[in-house]
């Protein structure tokens, strides 16, 4: 490869990445997932597109895609709160195992019939497209304002269901290569190995990496690089030992994100850029790999297979997988059934048969790609609509305009929160001395227009003022009520109810004020929060609703795992 060729590759790569970034704004305008934009640019640059770039190097595509997935999952793990596991761990694991098996089996049987393949070959197609994709889920769920039970279940499922899909794919390829038609007992051993090594190395490697980051003194710009290189090491080491590298790197990120860590803000900021670059690079390469003209001959059976999986196999697997978990209501089950997003992982798995050289490998690849396109276009574009129709969107937490990490003490993560005051905030016109600021928070600066003011207790706030407040993450709810702008998501203003009650209020007092008909045997001295937990059962989340005694009770706020405020809405006139 000479210097001119290398320079040409740099030029082409820069143009494609730059075009992807500039055209990403079309995603919100056209209402299509941003990943489809990246994929389309890759396809346009490919053999059948205007670019005419001939790219069929499957090993390189496999390398780029796995590296990108490792970075995306490391970032996703860091941003996943450990508290999410309280409500979603076991349901997500059920979907990641039982759900994938059912989806792969039903889809595989349909594929064998539609494409005139034998059962093992059909099941291989089912295994390839049987798991949801973490990159697609993390990208498309972000900012949708879903309740925690649903969003956490989908995210944890997408980060943990790849071991089953990878294992099924490799096992079925081995069976086809060896001419076998039945499974041996080693099937279970290999499955345990995939999950076991992924969990052990992921948690262990994450702990060691966390210890190293907190112990070693480095320039601040090197901590994010140490974190990402450590995550890739965990991914590659686990994969080399025949474990699930995808699960391992996700758990590694989870460890880093939920423990005190040096330069957290810098690491997260760098990871955000790396995750975007990884998504762009991965879908550009996959788009280059595809020849759209090869999809036309299989379009009708592949479309039928996609609809079969989306409308039947996935919903059935979700309803069966969530049977042991009564806390999920029907609306939540329907939405989770719909958001079985496919993305890069099925295409990466479809590369395995190509590299193994088994019969019909090109068919498997094209079918997987077609299913991914249908999933992103059909499910991805309708995700917001489905969330609204199933009433799973909750008012977003009031957030500052920007957050800047202050790397002062890894055990006390101080940040600077920036708020711009809108006209609907009650604090407009109030003197600073009258603000009930949370303990241990301080207003560090006040900007009015382009001027930096020197505020004192008599300074009165005006619309458009920009406040810089020093505090910690747990101060955000209280600060949000004081300073945040109104959320942009359109919701019923009375989502939580006609009025909101303190969950520490005694049930007896509330029943007398509102005329509640308490059942015999109910402890009237318990708090409203305790009574609501009794009504809901399981692990509640913000936005959970239940009708009781002619009223709709909605969990409005939670502190850790404790209900702190409850909304009440009148449903019917009580006699």
UniProtKB/Swiss-Prot annotation:
The keyword Membrane applies. The chain crosses the membrane at residues 3-23, 30-50, 58-78, 95-115, 122-142, 172-192, 194-214, 221-241, 270-290, 293-313, 334-354, 358-378. It holds the Pfam family TrkA_C. The keyword Flavoprotein does not apply. GO terms for molecular function: flavin adenine dinucleotide binding; potassium:proton antiporter activity. It is a multi-pass membrane protein. It is found in: Cell inner membrane. GO terms for cellular component: plasma membrane. It catalyses: K(+)(in) + H(+)(out) = K(+)(out) + H(+)(in). Residues 403-485 form the RCK C-terminal domain. GO terms for biological process: cell volume homeostasis. Belongs to the monovalent cation:proton antiporter 1 (CPA1) transporter (TC 2.A.36) family. NhaP2 subfamily. It comes from Yersinia enterocolitica serotype O:8 / biotype 1B (strain NCTC 13174 / 8081). The gene is nhaP2. Keywords: Antiport, Cell inner membrane, Cell membrane, Ion transport, Membrane, Potassium, Potassium transport, Transmembrane, Transmembrane helix, Transport. K(+)/H(+) antiporter that extrudes potassium in exchange for external protons and maintains the internal concentration of potassium under toxic levels. It comes from the Bacteria. InterPro entries: Cation/H_exchanger_TM, FAD-bd_PCMH-like_sf, FAD-bd_PCMH_sub2, Na+/solute_symporter_sf, NhaP2, RCK_C, RCK_C_sf, Transptr-assoc_dom. SMART domains: CorC_HlyC (SM01091). This is K(+)/H(+) antiporter NhaP2. Gene3D superfamilies: 1.20.1530.20, 3.30.465.10, Regulator of K+ conductance, C-terminal domain.
